[in-house]
Amino acid sequence: MKNIICFLFLSIVGFTYAQKGDPEIIKKPINYSSERVNLSIDYLKSHYNITQNTATISPKMIVLHYTAGGTVETNFKYFNKTHLESARNTLKKQSTLNVSSQYIIDRDGTIYQLMEPNMFARHTIGLNYCAIGIENIGSKKQPLTEQQITANAQLVRYLTKKYNIEYLIGHSEYGAFRNSKLWKETDPNYFTIKEDPGKDFMNKVRLLVSDLHLKDKP
């Protein structure tokens, strides 16, 4: 009975938000310096065989993540650095370009934009050239909130309308795209197992945007 009530509630909320306008987004840009631009352009070429003179993407996909801890401020400070920290050896061997995402959502559902949605961010191996990343403050021990579920659904709806998005996945699901036409990673051994943001979270977000018919597989 509890699951039925939850399903009905989320369905009603989903319908309600389908009728609303764009979500409130607070711009909080990280330092996208000329060095970061050049590292991003190099990454596009070396990992995707994409040669261009701008650090931009053509979004087809949205990938939801969690930060595995911290606050908006601590994660902002981390993403704001151009270079990866030395402890992340596996990633650093591929490029010194720091990880980042286009958006980060706080536990109360506040949405922050860290860069323009069509700017390149390193957040999902093999798919960064076409994927918008949304980070959520939380972890396995600090489950994501109902406010974040709602905010993610609003943001997904807004971005889908703006960029004609086709796919919505969680970071843990990105492996399904290996060996597909969308997967452009040039190093066949460059892959890491992820578990964020969790099946329950993805199911709830997908329920709220089910009318968009976004795919989760190639």
Regions found by a protein language model. Give the residues of each.
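N-terminal catalytic cores of peptidoglycan-degrading enzymes
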Residues: 19-123
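Bacterial Sec-dependent N-terminal signal peptides
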Residues: 1-20
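Second-shell loop/turn segments in exported
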Residues: 50-51, 100-101, 136-145
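Envelope-exposed proteins and targeting segments
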Residues: 60, 99, 130-132, 164
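Basic/polar, cationic surfaces and motifs that engage anionic cell-wall
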Residues: 19-38, 139-218
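Solvent-exposed, acidic/flexible segments
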Residues: 55-57, 96, 127, 141-149
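Cell-envelope and extracellular/periplasmic
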Residues: 68, 130, 135-141
